[in-house]
C-alpha cells in the first residue's frame, strides 16, 4: 500500500514522504495511529494544504520531547526480582514493568509503545533500554535487575554479581578442601615424627598414673 507519512518513521522516511508498505502494517499500525494517510489524490491534496501545520505541530512535540529527554536519558531504574544462583529470573521483566518503574521514579508520560524491548528480560544484570519520546528523540534508560538493593548497588558499580558469587563459592570450597574433616585425615596430614612424639607423651602420662 502507498502511504503519505505524517511523521518520521524509522527505516521508512520523514514527513510528507510517499512510501510503499505492507498492507497489514499500514492498516494495523500506521493508519489507526495517525502516522500516515493513504496516498490517494484526495489525501495528497489534503496533506499539502496542511503541511505547514503538520510540520509545526511535529516541531512543537519534538521540542517538548527534547526538554523531557534531559531528565530521562541515562536514568537508571532498579527492579528487585527473585532469581536462581545462576542469575535466571523466576519470571521476567516486561515493558509494563519498566513503564511502572519509571512512573514510580517520577517519570510520567512514558507509554508501552515508547519502550523498545525486543524480548522480556530473564536474567539479573544491567540492560540498556531505548525509550522513544518522539520519532526523532530517543533516550536510553538503564534497567538494573537484582535480587536485593545491595546487589543492585554492586551492579551499578560495574560488578558482575553472579561471577563474584561464583568466585566466592569456589574460594570457600577450596578452603574447605584444605581443612581435615576427621581425626584420620588429621593424622594422615600430620608427619609421622609428630605422631610418634605425641604417642610417647601419652605413654609417659600413662606410666605416671600407674
Curated annotation (Swiss-Prot):
GO biological process: translation
Matches recorded under InterPro entries: Ribosomal_bL9, Ribosomal_bL9/RNase_H1_N, Ribosomal_bL9_bac/chp, Ribosomal_bL9_C, Ribosomal_bL9_C_sf, Ribosomal_bL9_N, Ribosomal_bL9_N_sf
Regions that span the bilayer: none
This protein's UniProt keywords: Ribonucleoprotein, Ribosomal protein, RNA-binding, rRNA-binding
GO molecular function terms noted in the UniProt entry: rRNA binding; structural constituent of ribosome
Entry keyword RNA-binding: yes
GO cellular component, one term: ribonucleoprotein complex
Start and end residues of each stretch annotated as Disordered: 172-210
Biased composition (Acidic residues): 199-210
Keyword Repressor: no
Family per record: Belongs to the bacterial ribosomal protein bL9 family.
Function recorded in the entry: Binds to the 23S rRNA.
Protein name, UniProt field: Large ribosomal subunit protein bL9
Species of provenance: Sphingopyxis alaskensis (strain DSM 13593 / LMG 18877 / RB2256)
Amino acid at each position: 500500500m502507498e502511504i503519505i507519512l505524517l511523521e518520521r518513521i524509522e527505516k521508512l522516511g520523514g514527513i510528507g514522504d510517499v512510501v510503499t508498505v505492507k498492507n497489514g502494517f499500514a492498516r494495523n499500525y500506521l493508519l489507526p495511529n495517525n502516522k500516515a494517510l493513504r496516498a490517494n489524490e484526495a489525501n495528497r491534496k489534503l496533506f499539502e494544504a496542511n503541511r505547514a501545520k503538520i510540520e509545526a505541530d511535529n516541531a512543537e512535540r519534538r521540542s517538548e520531547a527534547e526538554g523531557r529527554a534531559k531528565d530521562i536519558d541515562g536514568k537508571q531504574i532498579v527492579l528487585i526480582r527473585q532469581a536462581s544462583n545462576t542469575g535466571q529470573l523466576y519470571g521476567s521483566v516486561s515493558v509494563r514493568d519498566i513503564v511502572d518503574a519509571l512512573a514510580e521514579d517520577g517519570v510520567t508520560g512514558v507509554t508501552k509503545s515508547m519502550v523498545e524491548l525486543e524480548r522480556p528480560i530473564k536474567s539479573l544484570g544491567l540492560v540498556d533500554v531505548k525509550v522513544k519520546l518522539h520519532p526523532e528523540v530517543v533516550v536510553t534508560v538503564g534497567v538494573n535487575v537484582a535480587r536485593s538493593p545491595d546487589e543492585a548497588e554492586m551492579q551499578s558499580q560495574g560488578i558482575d554479581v553472579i561471577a563474584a558469587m561464583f568466585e566466592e563459592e569456589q574460594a570457600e570450597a577450596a578452603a574447605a578442601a584444605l581443612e581435615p574433616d576427621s581425626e584420620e585425615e588429621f593424622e594422615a596430614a600430620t608427619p609421622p615424627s609428630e605422631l610418634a612424639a605425641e604417642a610417647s607423651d601419652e605413654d609417659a602420662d600413662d606410666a605416671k598414673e600407674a
